[in-house]
């Protein structure tokens, strides 16, 4: 038996398979405002935060065990990630911001210095500008490609990607249709 083991061809070692969970942020004020006043709800207030209900959603959500959290640098996603994953390393990535960027002021992020003060455990090194340029046209294909490259080059195996409904739907379906929206705080398994 020992000689058979020695004679057996070596099994090629492939890189470990990555596991990703896409999570839409919890309910934000722009979601409530949209229900009350329509599209104006997206254009009145920049970088909206979570509602009390949103904080509750994040607190009771079932957060899959992960090694790292990649998070959009918008207030509502950072709050969601911090509530769902308080002890997991988090990296904010500009490429995870919501689409579209040109018309919805609710998708314009806060100043980097403010975000660093509010979320001291988050790595904001990807944010190169203090103030996000606006309007900021987005290439969704390039953004998804960048996240995939980051994940594939990382040593970690399990990731949460805390972002936005339209962004996640583009990854999952290749389309940017706003409706129907994904469920708040639900972990969608992403294929890479």
Regions found by a protein language model. Give the residues of each.
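A short, compositionally biased domain-edge/stem linker segment
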Residues: 2-14
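Short active-site segment of divalent metal-dependent hydrolases/proteases
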Residues: 28, 167-168
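Phosphate-handling substructures
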Residues: 29-33, 37-49, 84-145
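Glycine-rich phosphate-binding loop signature in dinucleotide/nucleotide-binding domains
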Residues: 63-65, 151-157
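A short acidic (Asp/Glu
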Residues: 79-83, 103, 170-174
């Amino acid at each position: 038996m020992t000689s058979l083991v020695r004679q057996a061809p070596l099994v090629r070692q492939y890189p470990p398979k990555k596991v990703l969970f896409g999570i839409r942020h919890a309910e934000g004020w722009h979601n409530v405002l949209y229900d009350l006043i329509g599209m104006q709800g997206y254009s009145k207030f920049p970088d909206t935060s979570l509602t009390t209900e949103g904080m509750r959603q994040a607190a009771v959500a079932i957060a899959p065990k992960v090694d790292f959290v990649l998070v959009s640098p918008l207030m509502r996603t950072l709050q969601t990630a911090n509530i769902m994953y308080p002890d997991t390393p988090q990296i904010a990535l500009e490429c995870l911001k919501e689409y579209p960027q040109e018309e919805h002021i609710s998708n314009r992020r806060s100043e980097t210095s403010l975000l660093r003060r509010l979320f001291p455990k988050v790595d904001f090194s990807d944010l190169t500008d203090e103030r996000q340029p606006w309007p900021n046209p987005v290439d969704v294909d390039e953004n998804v490609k960048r996240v995939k490259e980051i994940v594939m080059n990382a040593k970690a195996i399990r990731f949460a990607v805390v972002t936005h409904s339209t962004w996640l739907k583009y990854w999952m379906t290749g389309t940017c249709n706003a409706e129907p929206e994904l469920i708040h705080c639900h972990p969608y398994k992403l294929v890479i």
